[in-house]
Regions:
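Proteins enriched for Cys/Gly/acidic motifs involved in redox and nucleic-acid/cofactor modification
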Residues: 2-208
C-alpha cells in the first residue's frame, strides 16, 4: 500500500498520497449501510460536542451527518467552548483565509486543552487531504487527537473509541475514495431545509 501507515501504543497514522490519489478514476466504490458497532453505544453519554464548519454546502451536509453520528453515540451539542468534551473542525482548503481562521482557532483551543487535558480535538474535511497541511498540523498542533479527511466520516466512532479507551492519537486520511455509506443519521440545522449530496468525491488531487 502506498499510504504511509504507522501504528503503536500512541498513534495510528495514514497520510495522503498523490500516488494513491491518481487511482481514483479506476478504483471501485462500494455502497454500504451505516452500522454502529454495539461497543460504541453510549461512548459519548454525558459528554458534549462542538462542531465548527468552514467552507461549502458539501461541508455543511457532512457536518449534519457528523452531528447525527455523535448524537447516536450519546453526545449532546453545545456552543460553550469550555463545556465541550469533543471539538471537531470540518475544514475548507480552497480559500486561504478559511485555512488561516482554522489555524487561529486550533491555537486558541490549544489553550483550552491545557486547562482541560481530557478535551478531544479533531480536524477533518479538505485541509487534511493536503500533504503539506498534514505536516504543518503535526508540527504546530501536537495537541490534536483526531485527523481525518473527506472519505471516512463513518469511522468517527472508531476514532473516538481509540482516543478514549486506547489513548491513541489517530491520523487517517484516505487518498482513494472510501466506500459510500447510506442511512447515516442526520441532525438538520433547519426544520425546513436540508443539504443533499448529489455526487461524492473527485477524480483529481487538491493542489491549492
Amino acid at each position: 500500500m502506498a499510504n504511509k501507515i504507522k501504528e503503536n501504543k500512541y498513534i495510528k497514522e495514514v497520510l495522503p498520497s498523490l500516488t494513491d490519489a491518481r487511482k481514483r478514476r479506476t478504483s471501485e466504490i462500494s455502497i454500504k449501510d451505516f452500522y454502529l458497532d454495539p461497543k460504541y453505544i453510549n461512548l459519548g453519554a454525558g459528554k458534549y460536542y462542538m462542531l465548527k464548519t468552514y467552507g461549502c454546502q458539501g461541508n455543511l451536509a457532512d457536518s449534519e451527518k457528523i452531528a447525527g453520528i455523535l448524537e447516536m453515540l450519546g453526545y449532546t451539542k453545545t456552543e460553550d467552548e469550555l463545556k465541550a468534551d469533543f471539538v471537531l473542525f470540518n475544514t475548507c482548503a480552497i480559500r486561504e483565509n478559511a485555512e488561516e481562521r482554522v489555524y487561529g482557532e486550533l491555537g486558541r483551543f490549544q489553550q483550552f486543552k491545557k486547562k482541560n487535558p481530557d478535551m478531544i480535538i479533531g480536524i477533518c474535511g479538505c485541509m487534511p487531504q493536503e500533504e503539506k497541511t498534514i505536516v504543518s498540523i503535526k508540527k504546530k498542533f501536537p495537541q490534536i487527537n483526531i485527523v481525518f479527511g473527506t472519505h471516512n466520516i463513518s469511522s468517527i466512532p472508531e476514532y473516538l473509541y481509540d482516543v478514549i479507551n486506547n489513548q491513541k492519537k489517530v491520523i487517517e486520511v484516505l487518498s482513494v475514495e472510501g466506500d459510500i455509506y447510506e442511512n447515516i443519521p442526520v441532525i438538520r440545522d433547519h426544520p425546513k431545509k436540508a443539504w443533499v449530496n448529489i455526487m461524492y468525491g473527485c477524480d483529481e488531487f487538491c493542489t491549492y
